[in-house]
Amino acid sequence: MAAACRSVKGLVALITGGASGLGLATAERLVGQGATAVLLDLPNSDGETQAKKLGKSCAFAPADVTSEKDVQAALTLAREKFGRVDVAVNCAGIAVASKTYNLKKSQAHTLEDFQRVINVNLIGTFNVIRLVAGEMGQNEPDQGGQRGVIINTASVAAFEGQVGQAAYSASKGGIVGMTLPIARDLAPMGIRVMTIAPGLFGTPLLTTLPDKVRNFLASQVPFPSRLGDPAEYAHLVQAIIENSFLNGEVIRLDGAIRMQP
């Protein structure tokens, strides 16, 4: 019988949005467990500094996830520096808060904002998936036939979108919806595809809010009643990588929260 679990030690991971938040926490954990990481993030991000902090087992690839040229360049960097790509973790994303129609302002949600969120969160994720799949397909399969693992980031907003989250929820719902068909598409290549749907996490977006607001948000989580720690997201990423029977599924990581309108 093929081994059910594999260690992350020695694996090479491409992590989008790797300069901060969930992406950086993932890089820190994987490198700490003996893996190698390539942080893919925008040129004006803190990616280069963070990669240097993580040492020789990490590199920075300045890139926009919506650009085929940029992502290909990042994959080339990973291959030339570390030999291959075994894991891809898609954490890059943006959010826009806007009602479909604001009656008080007599203003409709702009198509530009809606398209921008879809372009980065959904199309950007798919862009990375389709390109990294070709890279992983060149890997020698392990004893279980696996060549790679792709892990995407959705959100609980994919299931319980709040007021003003039409664009964000649509983008994350798209990631949820494409997880299974892509897993089926890539199964013959020995590539697994999973998605994590985080709840409220202590990422830069939330940690900059006033204490009163953060404490209120934390109180909405049934148990434990706090914001998630990015390290907990990273821990789940590692567990998914190491468990070869996880495929085509979306895992909520949210302390049982169900968002209200």
Curated annotation (Swiss-Prot):
Pfam families: adh_short. Substrate binds at residue 155. It catalyses: a (3S)-3-hydroxyacyl-CoA + NAD(+) = a 3-oxoacyl-CoA + NADH + H(+); (2S,3S)-3-hydroxy-2-methylbutanoyl-CoA + NAD(+) = 2-methyl-3-oxobutanoyl-CoA + NADH + H(+); testosterone + NAD(+) = androst-4-ene-3,17-dione + NADH + H(+); 5alpha-androstane-3alpha,17beta-diol + NAD(+) = 17beta-hydroxy-5alpha-androstan-3-one + NADH + H(+). Keywords: Acetylation, Fatty acid metabolism, Lipid metabolism, Mitochondrion, Mitochondrion nucleoid, NAD, Oxidoreductase, Steroid metabolism, tRNA processing. Pathway: Amino-acid degradation; L-isoleucine degradation; Lipid metabolism; fatty acid beta-oxidation; Steroid metabolism; Lipid metabolism; bile acid biosynthesis. The keyword Mitochondrion applies. One of its GO terms (molecular function) is tRNA binding. The modification N6-succinyllysine is found at residues 53, 212. The keyword Hydrolase does not apply. PROSITE patterns: ADH_SHORT. InterPro entries: NAD(P)-bd_dom_sf, Sc_DH/Rdtase_CS, SDR_fam. Its EC number is 1.1.1.35, 1.1.1.62, 1.1.1.239, 1.1.1.178. The modification N6-acetyllysine is found at residues 53, 69, 99, 105, 212. This is 3-hydroxyacyl-CoA dehydrogenase type-2. It comes from Bos taurus (Bovine). The gene is HSD17B10.
